[in-house]
């Protein structure tokens, strides 16, 4: 628990970090938040980059993984592989509502062609478990592998932002896909197995597909292009449902 939440001047901090590299941003986070620093992962296409980069600096950092219960088999195997290789301090969180129970109550929300259904799905399967993780782990700050090129919302981010009660820190914010590839190669790290199938981003099995001609963004391959964000990386307010609508996964 201990320790007070730092009161950061975000403009000053982001100006300072604008000259820093990704490792230096992680080191800054570790020094600024000696307690209550976590990271999140989706075990997605490029997740090995952040997992390796952060754990080289903070080996025992709690790594939060939201298991929706709908991930592809390959993702579960990839998670095991990376967890063992990097000796991750993995904290797995799931919705208290099982997939079968959710479908009985609400139907297959991902098949309902409206944002409200997708937002309900995301809240049940992703947002509520993440909020619980932040609370139970007494998180003050959260390292995430968001990059400016991924969604409209992410273009607006700084290296450090405030989301709800926590600070959010984005060490690879300005990295390009080429930077990611070069880091993976330099450290002999794996892509998710679906990369070889043409996927540039992967989430739940029912809402991800390979990149196709005509896609304007890699996030168009998720939720049939209707949403870009899942809600985990959008501001958490009392109007959660409405805020999820603003830029969704």
UniProtKB/Swiss-Prot annotation:
Transmembrane segments: none annotated. Keywords: Cytoplasm, Oxidoreductase. Pathway: Sulfur metabolism; hydrogen sulfide biosynthesis; sulfite from sulfate: step 3/3. Pfam families: PAPS_reduct. It is an enzyme of class 1 (oxidoreductase). It comes from the Bacteria. It catalyses: [thioredoxin]-disulfide + sulfite + adenosine 3',5'-bisphosphate + 2 H(+) = [thioredoxin]-dithiol + 3'-phosphoadenylyl sulfate. GO terms for cellular component: cytoplasm. It is found in: Cytoplasm. Its EC number is 1.8.4.8. The active site is at 230 (nucleophile). Its main location: cytoplasm. GO terms for molecular function: phosphoadenylyl-sulfate reductase (thioredoxin) activity. GO terms for biological process: hydrogen sulfide biosynthetic process; sulfate assimilation, phosphoadenylyl sulfate reduction by phosphoadenylyl-sulfate reductase (thioredoxin). Belongs to the PAPS reductase family. CysH subfamily. Catalyzes the formation of sulfite from phosphoadenosine 5'-phosphosulfate (PAPS) using thioredoxin as an electron donor. This is Phosphoadenosine 5'-phosphosulfate reductase. It comes from Picosynechococcus sp. (strain ATCC 27264 / PCC 7002 / PR-6) (Agmenellum quadruplicatum).
